[in-house]
Amino acid sequence: PHNVKGICPDADRVGIACKNDKGEWVLINGNQTCLLFLYYIIKNRIAMGKMKDDDFIVKTIVTTELIKSVADKNHIEMLDCYTGFKWIAREIRLREGKQQYIGGGEESYGFLAEDFVRDKDAVSACTLLAEICAWAKDQGKTLFEVLLDIYVEYGFSKETTVNVVKPGKSGAEEIKAMMENFRSNPPREIGGWR
């Protein structure tokens, strides 16, 4: 196989592994998963003549900005919302009857392809993934190559997750103190951004 997918026990997130150009297995992170799904949905709707002016997609503020590049280049409205699917569901609800939601997700592997569930849904995401893999195969490509095509067309992004562990009671107190400090002395600039 070229791809493997798995879902979490409560069936709301899907994880993907695929082979790269060297035949090595690589894990597709949540940002890449959301990017692949939205790229395919948009490209497929355009190819089928189903894209409409009132279509929109949603991502959370912590999800890759490459999705904005895909949306902008394809003239589709993209909304940023707070982290958590309740906020994505809120955007769908606010536009119900006025605009058509076509997909959305977040970097924590949650994705929603249709608007009838209103929460992340690994079952529909797995179905969508199978469709994307078949579409890629029809083009003579792997899932990994589709991801590379996205990077060539829209730009490349690389991220790394760093977990900082603060164990025990002293760790909890240290975290609490850090959060209180952030609230009372918010940074004026982060990474050169104001």
Can you annotate each of these PLM segments?
Residues 1-16:
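N-terminal small/polar loop signature for handling phosphorylated ligands or for N-terminal nucleophile
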Residues 12-30, 67:
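Short Gly/Thr/Asp-enriched flexible loops that form oxyanion-binding sites at enzyme active sites
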